[in-house]
A protein has these predicted regions:
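Short, well-structured active-site flanking segments
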Residues: 81-100, 187, 217-226
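Boundary segments of small protein-protein interaction reader/adaptor domains
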Residues: 103-105
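Active-site SXXK
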Residues: 65-93, 206
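Short helix- or helix-capping micro-motifs
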Residues: 125-132
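Penicillin-recognizing serine hydrolase domain
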Residues: 3-57, 63, 112-116, 121-124, ...
Length: 315
């Protein structure tokens, strides 16, 4: 068995899944949106971030998906960068009017933040990514808006109407797009930091972001690996990702770090990171499913194939 696989490469394993599992994948394409893309990150100091990975779409007709909450990875990474560069990581953020129900989309997933509650920035990052709380994303948005506008960072007295809220979102999203255009050469369709809008992005852009997170040893990777948040205001929140939760033994896998789930109609998505060694990872993107059960079944099939094929390979 070892001799059989010793010369096979990870890109060859990934590419081989396209024909091997096509009939199975095809049965899950109920929405017509199904996209399954695998990425291999194997870092070389002489390569740029955008060229430091291999990726292959093993099922699907398009290079674009509706990311839903996967888009939060882009937003939160930017917010964390701004907050850290302004030395606010140890401060307390007060929830303001940015989470008013009359402002936000009624379909947005929330954890029920209340005006006047206080959280640290990293607690809000955890809430944004682990239970995928849209209200936490909006609170981070308002703080970063204040920083960029040279307002007192915890202020929300200016937020008096839906028009003010919309201006905040438009401004923040323009800054996020500018940031990724400048730092990673990405042209993102990002018009709400939570991913609630149905804008299309390229799957390769997701790979570029994940490559950057790994290369920079981002705090985000430690956060999305958690099965639940730390205790926040006396409460913990479970991850939306079954593959990092030991209480979900059918799916839990010790090599999976996380990354993000996403959920809009016709776009139930799952992005996982399979760790091979400190500088070698495989990301699994399953997007466009009808339900989350299908994203997990497809991902389980791919993980089992990786386990079987990678077991005898020396890296």
């Amino acid at each position: 068995m070892k001799d059989l696989f010793k010369n096979i490469s990870i890109p060859e394993i990934i590419t081989g899944m396209e024909s091997k599992f096509y009939p199975i994948f095809n049965r899950y394409n109920i929405t017509g949106n199904l996209n399954i893309t695998l990425f291999n990150f194997n870092f070389n100091e002489n390569e740029s971030i955008e060229n430091s990975f291999f990726y292959n779409k093993i099922y699907g007709d398009s290079e674009y998906i509706v990311p839903a909450s996967i888009l939060k990875l882009f937003s939160v990474n930017y917010f964390l960068n701004i907050i850290e560069s302004n030395n606010l990581v140890d401060k307390k953020i007060t929830v303001g009017d940015e989470i008013r129900k009359t402002y936000i989309n009624p379909g947005l997933h929330r954890v029920g933040l209340k005006k006047g509650q206080s959280y640290s920035p990293l607690e809000l990052v955890e809430l944004s990514l682990v239970p995928s709380a849209g209200d936490a994303v909006y609170t981070l948005s308002r703080v970063v808006y204040n920083i960029l506008k040279n307002n007192p960072w915890n202020d929300f007295s200016w937020l008096k109407s839906k028009a003010d809220w919309i201006e905040m979102i438009q401004f923040i999203c323009s800054k996020i797009r500018d940031y990724y255009r400048t730092t990673l050469n990405l042209d993102l369709n990002l018009f709400d930091p939570t991913g609630i809008q149905r804008d299309l992005i390229q799957v390769k852009d997701i790979g570029t972001l994940v490559s950057s997170l790994i290369n920079n040893n981002s705090k985000i990777l430690n956060i999305v690996a958690k099965s639940q948040t730390t205790k926040i205001n006396g409460r913990t929140y479970n991850s939306t990702n079954a593959f990092v939760r030991k209480d979900k033994p059918y799916f839990y896998h010790p090599k999976i770090i996380g990354l993000k789930t996403g959920s809009l109609s016709g776009w139930k998505n799952l992005l996982l990171l399979y760790k091979l060694k400190p500088i070698n990872y495989i990301a699994i993107l399953v997007a466009g499913c009808e339900n989350h059960s299908d994203t997990k079944k497809i991902s389980s099939l791919i993980i089992k194939e990786l386990d079987n094929k990678l077991f005898n390979i020396s890296f």
